């Protein structure tokens, strides 16, 4: 595929942007079109609640949206989408299919890889997860002293950690009757030491999540957990009752002491950051119950079908992707904020920080050439209203344009004080997107200062600081309630958004070679940290850092 910058549709879009973008004033666009909200929003009825995607507060008009959709068609988005769903090996650097959609394929229609339907295997693992969850949650699964399991500790990193952590936090209200769940990812010993300190070996079950069962951080933490466990249990055969594996490497799992019967497999067509739908989601199913895990899968499947079958101009993941292309490749925006107004979604932005940045943080195209345009944005965010008192200042009055997605449920899980808290939360959510769109004109600020009784001199000094330019773009994503089904749909919506942008940029969204170099060098450096002899094999900075660490290692502090 030709580079994006040489695509005639993109050149047309860029020309239009250069000539007309200065005239896209959101206040004026809303005043000129009373139907703007209806024309630039989607109301998705999932039959398990609604998801409203309001993109009317973006710097677009019908002409821009039409050009963006034409651009998507010219970049082959529809064919690429169909290739993914049909099991083609679209992860071309690793020669793999990309089939997280098969993991949640509730219709059970065949999906083939190399001519073989993967659905029987997917369903076999789901059935195994279901019976395991029932045994643990009912108390039938006993530890080495005959006690039931009260705590699940998921040991993994990256995709084996961020997804299950985000989802178990988001679905806490659905965890009644389930074991508590803990996540250990960091190689920093503090993480596992602090976690184990509050647990009892007799009632703890460890999930070791590693596809290869060789991930350094995960296996080091797993060995530490096993040591801690055996200090109490004494008998190595007890490991089988307290450790299960999510892996594809039976030999390594067995060597660790885990019964292969307690190994839940997944496949090379499941990427780590798209794996919470697979056996990697075992901690989710244990915590909230398998029925709720199935609802999560069903919500994602609903969004998969919407993405697969809906024309591009009414397709939520596609529209979100195209708006991102508009801001990144025409306006030069470098970041994207995800701002969920729901405390249960407090890890949502962190999850999609990996989802987006590990997928589209690439500068090499399918042909092996370097791109001559921007690709994936820096993704970040915090829950509202906390963010309002932290970084929104820069979004409102800073020098950078930061497109934002605001997300909120209409119904709260905790309608305390007759819904007062949630009413205030909703009011803040609505106020922020309106404020970012409208801003505050000098004459509006002047009236406020006069009403506050400011002297003419003070008024003139303060006035420039009280003006808001506005015209800051946002999407509002409003859903009935944060249920397992709706959460599944929201996650899938963003997954497909990321996929569409990768196709537009002609990069592989499903490998992550950028993770490898640091890991290779760390293996080389680790033995050099032994002893006290000087190291000279690196650049002067790295050598100097190693020397400082060696000097300070045994320093006694008062």
Curated annotation (Swiss-Prot):
Residue pairs linked by disulfide bridges in the UniProt entry: none
InterPro entries: G6P_Isomerase (IPR001672), G6P_Isomerase_C (IPR023096), Phosphoglucose_isomerase_CS (IPR018189), SIS_dom_sf (IPR046348), SIS_PGI_1 (IPR035476), SIS_PGI_2 (IPR035482)
Modified residues (N-acetylalanine): 2
Positions bearing Phosphoserine: 86, 107, 185, 455
Keyword annotations of the record: Acetylation, Cytokine, Cytoplasm, Gluconeogenesis, Glycolysis, Growth factor, Isomerase, Phosphoprotein, Secreted, Ubl conjugation
N6-succinyllysine PTM positions: 454
A molecular function GO annotation: growth factor activity
Chief location bin: cytoplasm
Active-site residues, record numbering mapped to chain: 358 (proton donor), 389, 519
N6-malonyllysine PTM positions: 454
Enzyme class per UniProt: isomerase
Annotated GO biological process: canonical glycolysis; erythrocyte homeostasis; fructose 6-phosphate metabolic process; gluconeogenesis; glucose 6-phosphate metabolic process; glucose homeostasis; glycolytic process; glycolytic process through glucose-6-phosphate
Sequence positions that bind D-glucose 6-phosphate: 159-160, 210-215, 354, 358, 389, 519
Keyword Ubl conjugation in annotation: yes
Effect of loss of the gene: Embryonic lethality caused by impaired gastrulation. During early development, the egg cylinder fails to be divided into the three cavities, suggesting a deficiency in extraembryonic mesoderm formation resulting in the failure to form the amnion or chorionic mesoderm.
Transmembrane segments: none
Family matches, as PROSITE patterns: P_GLUCOSE_ISOMERASE_1, P_GLUCOSE_ISOMERASE_2, P_GLUCOSE_ISOMERASE_3
Annotated pathway: Carbohydrate degradation; glycolysis; D-glyceraldehyde 3-phosphate and glycerone phosphate from D-glucose: step 2/4
Stored PANTHER family: GLUCOSE-6-PHOSPHATE ISOMERASE (PTHR11469:SF1)
Function: In the cytoplasm, catalyzes the conversion of glucose-6-phosphate to fructose-6-phosphate, the second step in glycolysis, and the reverse reaction during gluconeogenesis. Besides it's role as a glycolytic enzyme, also acts as a secreted cytokine: acts as an angiogenic factor (AMF) that stimulates endothelial cell motility. Acts as a neurotrophic factor, neuroleukin, for spinal and sensory neurons. It is secreted by lectin-stimulated T-cells and induces immunoglobulin secretion.
Name of the protein: Glucose-6-phosphate isomerase
Organism of provenance: Mus musculus (Mouse)
């Amino acid at each position: 595929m030709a580079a994006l910058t040489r695509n005639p549709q993109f050149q047309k879009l860029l020309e239009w942007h250069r000539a007309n973008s200065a005239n896209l004033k959101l206040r004026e666009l809303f005043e000129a079109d009373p139907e703007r909200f209806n024309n630039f929003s989607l109301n998705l009825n999932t039959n398990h609640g609604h998801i409203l995607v309001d993109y009317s507060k973006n710097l677009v008009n019908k002409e821009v949206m039409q050009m963006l959709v034409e651009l998507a068609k010219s970049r082959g988005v529809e064919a690429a989408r169909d290739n993914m769903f049909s099991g083609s090996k679209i992860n071309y650097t690793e020669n793999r299919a990309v089939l997280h959609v098969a993991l949640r394929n509730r219709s059970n229609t065949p999906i083939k890889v190399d001519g073989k339907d993967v659905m029987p295997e997917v369903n076999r693992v789901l059935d195994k997860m279901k019976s395991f969850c029932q045994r643990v949650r009912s108390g039938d699964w006993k530890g080495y002293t005959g006690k039931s399991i009260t705590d699940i500790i998921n040991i993994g990193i990256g995709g084996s950690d961020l997804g299950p952590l985000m989802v178990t936090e988001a679905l806490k209200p659905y965890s009644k009757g389930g074991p508590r769940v803990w996540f250990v990812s960091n190689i920093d010993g503090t993480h596992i030491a602090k976690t184990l300190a509050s647990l009892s070996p007799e009632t703890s079950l460890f999930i070791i999540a590693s596809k290869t069962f060789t991930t350094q951080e995960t296996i080091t933490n797993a060995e530490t957990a096993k040591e801690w466990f055996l200090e109490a249990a004494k008998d190595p055969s007890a490991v089988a009752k307290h450790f299960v594996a999510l892996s594809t490497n039976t030999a390594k799992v067995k060597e660790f002491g885990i019964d292969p019967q307690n190994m839940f497999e997944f496949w090379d067509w499941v990427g780590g950051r798209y794996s919470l739908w697979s056996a990697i989601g075992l901690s989710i199913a244990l915590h909230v119950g398998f029925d709720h895990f199935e609802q999560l899968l069903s919500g994602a499947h609903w969004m998969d079908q919407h993405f697969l079958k809906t024309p591009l101009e009414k397709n939520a993941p596609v529209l979100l992707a195209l708006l991102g292309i508009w801001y990144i490749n025409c306006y030069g925006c470098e970041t994207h904020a995800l701002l969920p107004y729901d405390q249960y979604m407090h890890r949502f932005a962190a999850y999609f920080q990996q989802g987006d940045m590990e997928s589209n943080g690439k500068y090499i195209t399918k042909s092996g050439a370097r791109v001559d345009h921007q690709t994936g944005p820096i993704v970040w965010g915090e829950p509202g209203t906390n963010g309002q008192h932290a970084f929104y200042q820069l979004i409102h009055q800073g020098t950078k344009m930061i497109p934002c997605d605001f997300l909120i449920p209409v119904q709260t899980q905790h309608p305390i004080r007759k819904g007062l808290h949630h009413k205030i939360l909703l009011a803040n959510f609505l106020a922020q997107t309106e404020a970012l769109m409208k801003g505050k004109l000098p004459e509006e600020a002047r009236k406020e200062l006069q009403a506050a009784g400011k002297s003419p001199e003070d008024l003139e000094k303060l006035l420039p600081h009280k003006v808001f330019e506005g015209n800051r773009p946002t999407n509002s994503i409003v859903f009935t309630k944060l249920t397992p089904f709706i959460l599944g749909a929201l996650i899938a919506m963003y997954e497909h958004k990321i996929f569409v942008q990768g196709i537009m940029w002609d990069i592989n969204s499903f490998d992550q070679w950028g993770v490898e170099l640091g890991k290779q060098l760390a293996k080389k450096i680790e033995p050099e940290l032994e002893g006290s002899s000087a190291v000279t094999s690196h650049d002067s900075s790295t050598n100097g850092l190693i020397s400082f660490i060696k000097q300070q290692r045994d320093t006694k502090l008062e």
